[in-house]
Amino acid sequence: MWKFSECGKGYSGVAIAEGKIYTAGDFGDHEYVLALDLDGKLLWKSPNGQAWHGASPGSRTTPTYNEGRLYHMNPHGRLAALDAATGNEIWAVDLKERFNAQFGVWALAENVVVEGNKVLCLPGGPKGRVVALDKRTGQTLWVNTEVQDTAAYCSPTVVTHAGRRQLITMTQKLVLGVDVETGKLLWSAPFVPKSPQNALTPVYRDGYVFVACGHSTGGTLFRIDQAAGTARVVWHRQDLDNCHGGALLIDGKLFGCGCRMGGRNFYCVDFLTGRSIKLDKSLGKVGITAADGMIYALNHRGTMSLVALTPDGFEVVSQFELKKKPDNTYLAHPVVCGGRLYLRCENDLFAFDLRAKPTSP
């Protein structure tokens, strides 16, 4: 349909709301949040602090949309609220200054979550490991300093477990749950990777939580024991060492992709037992999303695969190639919305019409 080639340098994905497309990218020494219309035309471009020139330069996070506002955190910890219609800044907080944010070599990479009146994030600093800010003003609502660890690279998930809304996430060496209303640490368990790269959003279902890390750490299913303030290991597989590609739970089956172990298999396993249902090395190392009964898998060098769900796991239905790039270039996950597929790669954003009928020969 179209290609927009002024996204800036970075790995941010896209968020789509109210007929607009939002992303972020680095231009020179500054990071910007951008808004496009559905035809791929730039509507506005608003700065949010300094660009990231450290390891793997470029933007990391995708703006979060909520009730006419965008919430975006840059790699240095500047968290800003913007008017989604105009890009005008409403408030901004320096997480390093307020909470002494501490993070790893690849900077902060968390997509913040909005829950009710709160913006939730994990600065990982001694003045605030996990925090909640008022989404209207940026004022601090609560601070958790019980967690004794620094920020990792994953985005959290918010679920209801044992009657309480809780944020589940990973730090550098822990998987944990925090009460959304109070900030109290509800439970935690060690999850110590071989390489400090915890980037997978935890997958939750009925008291079970799957987390993983790449570079031979592997994937682990935990069962929360909230009364004891911990979570217990149900199973562990070293070959399910997801890195940044995400994992999906569909009808009791867990889908994802290994990093180093198992030859970068795209996998389908039983969620509760870890038993293999199907493995496939042909897709490469992929980032995934699901829509309309299909899985969309973009590998890190530019091959896009459409994967059908089947009784015995999955089947690759079709593939096409974007411009081939080196490993770990196509890191933004595919996004499907309104019958379109959006793919971001560095400066480029592609939009494909999923409803278009093939041209007759």
Which residue stretches match the model-derived regions?
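Noncatalytic, solvent-exposed loop/strand surfaces
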Residues: 1-361
